[in-house]
Amino acid sequence: MHLQKLKYLFLALFLWQCSPSEQYEVADNPLDGGRYFIENSMQGNFKKAKFYIVEDAENLALFEKMASNYFGLDKEGRMQIRLASIQINEITAVDSTMSILNYQNSFDKEVHKLRIISTPKGWKVDLKYTYGQN
């Protein structure tokens, strides 16, 4: 009897270890989708930031370039970005499935725009809009 309980305990622990440990919060609205992406990118948490982008070949290539640029900065440059605050200037709904987020951060004070799209997996950022011709 005791051995049986022990087997179930080990099975439960094994299954718990096999389950994905990094569950990220699904963005329920465009503001959250954009904010989660921006915050994690600025913190250098590109694994989590990647969860908040539309996953297609072009977006993934742009995302990898963005991450490479971040890690190409020296330690002080990355620290300045991590410490910068985010200012959301405006969010505009294009339609019920797409919004444009206009923001800047206190580090570069440059205005940036993100297109955020509703997907079955929550609101996700489309980097093609930001880095393409818009």
What residue spans do the PLM features occupy?
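Exposed beta-sheet edge and beta->alpha loop/turn motif
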Residues: 83-134
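Short solvent-exposed beta->alpha transition segments
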Residues: 26, 31-32, 36, 41-94
